[in-house]
């Protein structure tokens, strides 16, 4: 794929930003990875807002709080899905960009050489 000069400038600026904030990014990622957010749907009467269990609810709350601290509007769809919006002002478009992710993880098995939820960076 060939980038235009403007696109290349954007990629370069993003790379410089990431390099300048790498330590913060790694710290925040490690904090997130400490949640043992294994989906647990075994409870026939889950707590409201926690259909996938309490650990997934905890990581949802963490991400909702982080987005709020960063000034981003959020919406929690009863613990099934969350939405974090990057508001654009004075942008005339009907198109959105969506990043889809999940916050639950697979169970840790016995193949780990250290605690799966204690990231080492």
Q: Model features per residue range: what roles?
A:
Residues 93-121:
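Active-site metal-coordination/substrate-binding segment of hydrolases
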Residues 36, 63-67, 99:
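Buried hydrophobic positions in well-ordered alpha/beta secondary-structure cores of metabolic enzymes
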Residues 41-94, 118-119:
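A non-catalytic alpha/beta surface segment that caps or lines the substrate-entry region
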Residues 3-54:
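N-terminal capping segment at the start of a domain
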Residues 1-2, 32-36, 86-91, 116:
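Short hydrophobic/aromatic-rich motifs at helix boundaries and adjacent loops
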């Amino acid at each position: 794929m060939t980038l235009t000069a403007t696109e290349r400038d954007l990629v370069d600026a993003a790379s410089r930003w990431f390099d300048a904030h790498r330590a913060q990014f790694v710290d925040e990622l490690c904090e997130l990875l400490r949640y043992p957010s294994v989906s647990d749907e075994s409870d026939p009467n889950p707590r409201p807002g926690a259909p996938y269990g309490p650990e997934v609810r905890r990581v949802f709350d963490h991400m909702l709080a982080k987005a709020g601290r960063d000034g981003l509007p959020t919406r929690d769809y009863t613990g099934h899905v969350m939405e974090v919006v990057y508001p654009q002002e004075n942008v005339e478009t009907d198109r959105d960009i969506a990043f889809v992710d999940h916050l639950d993880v697979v169970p840790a098995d016995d193949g780990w050489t250290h605690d799966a939820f204690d990231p080492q960076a």
